[in-house]
């Protein structure tokens, strides 16, 4: 009986590791924003990415969490996709005060808004209001 449980637990662990690996691959793609080409163009112009701008604003080594990285995942394929709905939202600390920061991602359709972009911005505002 214990052997059967161990085999089942091992199968579950392998399944979960595979799913976690898939999620991490998807996140890596999402973090590329509009793609390597657009990221390179942004860098050539001397600009920072949305995530870099947020990191520069937030207190160093302070806790932070990104909200909605998977927003619009798989949507708007006819437009080339909209990773993170074209906007990065992070809860973090500025001058030791917790806040929510929103930055448009210029690498995603030059910062154009999609319907999910508006929803994500509204959700960021709701979170800020709920946690005043």
Where do the PLM segments sit?
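Terminal-region recognition feature
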Residues: 1-132
């Amino acid at each position: 009986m214990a052997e059967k449980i161990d085999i089942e637990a091992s199968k579950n662990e392998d399944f979960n590791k595979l799913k976690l690996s898939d999620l991490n691959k998807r996140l890596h793609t999402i973090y590329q924003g509009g793609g390597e080409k657009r990221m390179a163009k942004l860098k050539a112009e001397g600009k920072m990415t949305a995530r870099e701008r947020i990191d520069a604003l937030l207190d160093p080594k302070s806790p932070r969490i990104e909200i909605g990285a998977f927003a619009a995942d798989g949507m708007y394929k006819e437009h080339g996709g909209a990773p993170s709905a074209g906007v990065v939202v992070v809860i973090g600390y500025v001058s030791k005060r917790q806040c929510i920061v929103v930055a448009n991602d210029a690498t995603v359709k030059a910062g154009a808004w999609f319907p999910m972009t508006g929803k994500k911005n509204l959700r960021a505002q709701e979170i800020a209001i709920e946690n005043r």
